[in-house]
Amino acid sequence: MSYITKQDKVIAEAIEREFQRQNSNIELIASENFVSEAVMEAQGSVLTNKYAEGYPGRRYYGGCEFVDVTESIAIDRAKALFGAEHVNVQPHSGSQANMAVYLVALEMGDTVLGMNLSHGGHLTHGAPVNFSGKFYNFVEYGVDKDTERINYDEVRKLALEHKPKLIVAGASAYSRTIDFKKFKEIADEVNAKLMVDMAHIAGLVAAGLHPNPVEYADFVTTTTHKTLRGPRGGMILCKEEYKKDIDKTIFPGIQGGPLEHVIAAKAVAFGEALENNFKTYQQQVVKNAKVLAEALINEGFRIVSGGTDNHLVAVDVKGSIGLTGKEAEETLDSVGITCNKNTIPFDQEKPFVTSGIRLGTPAATTRGFDEKAFEEVAKIISLALKNSKDEEKLQQAKERVAKLTAEYPLYQ
């Protein structure tokens, strides 16, 4: 950071302090990860200087011959990773990727079936405060009250009743395998298109550890960070028949110049995901999540749906020990464990309070945490949350966090 330090000491200090926070804390936010130095280097490259409206070989600016190379490589690698017919790597975020699909598949006011946010869905799947809920008529499906898993019979019933033009599958806080084949069958039955938002599970899909939605969906959207371990950004995968509509909706429809430095970083991350050790990493992510869930159950915590099939563990802290999600998040943060409060199915608390917390294993697994480390993480979580007013116990938890993070340093 020598250049930043010379130019802007205040920003340099903030960046350095953020690095120290990441290095000294255990990161359990399920949507976060640590990218490689190669990904960061690509994102901080001279490509940030280049305007490149359009697509490879069809630009509105001169001098795009090299960004054409990096963007084409990103597209080809994404196709190889997921077996997609067409890929657009230009969306700046997952939300913009979702917006583009809606603009292609729907007219304003059309009916869409999407997962309830408090049951594990996402803001862009029809939340009233989001553009999706304002522009379209979203009908919500959720999970079964007893199993806390998606009730496909209920999804089918709602689809038959409301005849949606589009069905959205995918979630931001759902810890079980999603049956895309069933969603496709339901969509076909009511003559709806199927969109899958695989933002949270894209890395698992790439590694073959979760069913691939590309086989079933008309459109698949994703972020490129989270389990995919790339830069913050979005991507759309679709059938060849939708290529022109998707591309013109991204540009010039909702975006101008693409972020070619970010696209180059996406290409680097996709290249990493094509390597054999990426599958090993994803296998460890899932192993660690299962160990974390089981260890917390042994400590007396109720896990939503009773466990996990992926990278994510949803914990009912209110029902387990009487703390709200907000209180649990703040307590864990005080000892060096970063997570987020999260609504759980049929939550009675407000969204900014919640009854649950969402935990994820991708970031800590990138640091090298294994099953034994996550057993210790569960014990530290239990110690802190069960003694949230006991400064001595909280100090013990903090010291145990420091010992773990020292054992698995970041970017060393």
Curated annotation (Swiss-Prot):
GO terms for biological process: glycine biosynthetic process from serine; tetrahydrofolate interconversion. Keywords: Amino-acid biosynthesis, Cytoplasm, One-carbon metabolism, Pyridoxal phosphate, Transferase. The record marks 225 as: Plays an important role in substrate specificity. Pathway: One-carbon metabolism; tetrahydrofolate interconversion; Amino-acid biosynthesis; glycine biosynthesis; glycine from L-serine: step 1/1. The keyword Cytoplasm applies. The modification N6-(pyridoxal phosphate)lysine is found at residue 226. Its cofactor is pyridoxal 5'-phosphate. The keyword Amino-acid biosynthesis applies. InterPro entries: PyrdxlP-dep_Trfase, PyrdxlP-dep_Trfase_major, PyrdxlP-dep_Trfase_small, Ser_HO-MeTrfase, Ser_HO-MeTrfase-like, Ser_HO-MeTrfase_PLP_BS, SHMT-like_dom. It catalyses: (6R)-5,10-methylene-5,6,7,8-tetrahydrofolate + glycine + H2O = (6S)-5,6,7,8-tetrahydrofolate + L-serine. It is found in: Cytoplasm. Belongs to the SHMT family. Homodimer. This is Serine hydroxymethyltransferase. It comes from Staphylococcus aureus (strain COL). The lineage of its organism: Bacteria, Bacillati, Bacillota, Bacilli, Bacillales. The gene is glyA.
